[in-house]
Amino acid sequence: MQKNIYVLYGGPSTEHEVSITSARTLINNLSKEKYNVNAIFVRRNKKFIMKENITEEIKSDEELILDTDLSVIESVSECIRKINPENTVIFPAIHGSYGEDGTIQGFIKVLDLPFVGCNVLGSALCMDKGYTNDIFELNKIPQAKYVVLCKNDDYNLKEIFEKTSKAVYVKPCNAGSSVGVMRAETEEELEKAIQNAFQYDRRILVEEEIIGPELQIAVMGNDNPVASRPGVYQIHDVEFFDYDAKYNDSKTEMLTPFPMDEKLELKARHLAEKVYKLMSLSGFSRVDMFVKDNELWVNEINTVPGLTPHSMFPVLWKCTNDMSVSEVFDNLIGLAVEEYKKNKAYKLER
């Protein structure tokens, strides 16, 4: 019997377009023999539109941009009515706010359906980089020195540099794909970067610059997660790995696996698994960390990592254990069902 898969994508975040590309990769690599594949597009205005029973290849992102005249509530209700609750798994591919902050996960839990990826708590904790760093600090996870600022805080630029380093990165706490990130070495640059980051979020993070390769490690699993071999994006002619370098720069190269000392690689993989469990994650995530002088610093966790042709997550499993993209997605769907059944087994009454 075919499973009904509903790929949920789009959303109101700054990573809307990336989500559409991830959804296309997903839809095209899900076996149409195993699955009845459906797509649910969430417009920027939060209207839901469903494309049912997809059997042909989606050749462009434009095919997945859908519209409706219904209101938000009407469109959501219409989609819920169309979802077959039997033998069904929801596959969220919404990046950034709304998709990675626990919002959509809570919505699906209300529907009492299995879904791929992290739970509400893990998603919410990892979405805010400031809170993530606070938890890392309490648990002695190695990371860059940092300062969190809120919109109406008083701050001293000189003190921020003293608490971090002579060069820093400023980023919104609740954005991904390097949206709103700027580097600063002077007080003038820092003030400009702070004001820029506050355009995207009311909480921002100022972090010490660590110069060294940024490892990306895919992690998959529920109670017993497994980390992939590390990969690195090699970038050219840009200061850091920004949005354009991630998705638009043809010169950006993937090094998978990243050549490094065998013991250090094993340490990095174990560290990725450790923070995955620490943050109460399930399904899948990507853990990013810097390596310098044989030391590791965890940077961030992406609970809905990119699944585009330029994304690291599926490629890392190919170089780790020769899994195809389709096999990765099959595994994630299986993990979703496993987690759902486990949670349903817990008592809700005394």
UniProtKB/Swiss-Prot annotation:
It is found in: Cytoplasm. Its main location: cytoplasm. Binds 2 magnesium or manganese ions per subunit. Its cofactor is Mg(2+); Mn(2+). SUPFAM superfamilies: Glutathione synthetase ATP-binding domain-like (SSF56059), PreATP-grasp domain (SSF52440). Mg(2+) 2 binds at residues 300, 302. It comes from the Bacteria. Keywords: ATP-binding, Cell shape, Cell wall biogenesis/degradation, Cytoplasm, Ligase, Magnesium, Manganese, Metal-binding, Nucleotide-binding, Peptidoglycan synthesis. Its EC number is 6.3.2.4. GO terms for molecular function: ATP binding; D-alanine-D-alanine ligase activity; metal ion binding. GO terms for biological process: cell wall organization; peptidoglycan biosynthetic process; regulation of cell shape. Pfam families: Dala_Dala_lig_C (PF07478), Dala_Dala_lig_N (PF01820). This is D-alanine--D-alanine ligase. The gene is ddl.
